[in-house]
C-alpha cells in the first residue's frame, strides 16, 4: 500500500495490522553490541510475552552477570532451573556465581549437573574444561562450615 493511499484513507482495518516486535532477537542483538542494559529491557519485554520460557530467564541471568548484578543473575538462573532442570547453561552460570559467593557445596552440585549433560558445539570444550577445573578446585577446598 502506498503512502498516499494511507494518507487519504485508503487503508482498511485489515491492511493495517500491528506487528509484534521480536524482543528476544532485539535483546540478543543489543547484547552482541555490548548494550547490556538495553538488552535487559528487551529481555524483560520478551519475558512478558513468554513468562515461562526458561531460556529467556537464562539470557536475563547472563545479562545480569555481564552488568555485575550477581544477585539478580542468581535469582534468574534459579527461576530458569525451576522451569527446566536440564538447562545446562543455567547450571554452569549459577555454579560460578555460587562459587564466587563461597557457596561451594551447591556450586559443586551445579557443576556436576552441567558436566553430566555437557553442551555440544564448537566452543563447548572450552566451557567443559573450565567447569572440570572449577570442580576439581572446589573438591579440594575444605567443606563449608555450617
Regions found by a protein language model. Name each.
Residues 16-52:
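Alpha-helical segment of the N-proximal tetratricopeptide repeat
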Amino acid at each position: 500500500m502506498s503512502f498516499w493511499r494511507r494518507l487519504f484513507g485508503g487503508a482498511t482495518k485489515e491492511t493495517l495490522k500491528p506487528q509484534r516486535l521480536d524482543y528476544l532477537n532485539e535483546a540478543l542483538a543489543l547484547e552482541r553490541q555490548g548494550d547490556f542494559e538495553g538488552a535487559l529491557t528487551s529481555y524483560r519485554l520478551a519475558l512478558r510475552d513468554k513468562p515461562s520460557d526458561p531460556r529467556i530467564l537464562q539470557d536475563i541471568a547472563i545479562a545480569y552477570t555481564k552488568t555485575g548484578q550477581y544477585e539478580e543473575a542468581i535469582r534468574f538462573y534459579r527461576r530458569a532451573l525451576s522451569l527446566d532442570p536440564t538447562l545446562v547453561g543455567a547450571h554452569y552460570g549459577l555454579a560460578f556465581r555460587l562459587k564466587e559467593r563461597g557457596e561451594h557445596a551447591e556450586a559443586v552440585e551445579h557443576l556436576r549437573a552441567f558436566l553430566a549433560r555437557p553442551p555440544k558445539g564448537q566452543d563447548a570444550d572450552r566451557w567443559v574444561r573450565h567447569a572440570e577445573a572449577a570442580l576439581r578446585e572446589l573438591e579440594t577446598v575444605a567443606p563449608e562450615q555450617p
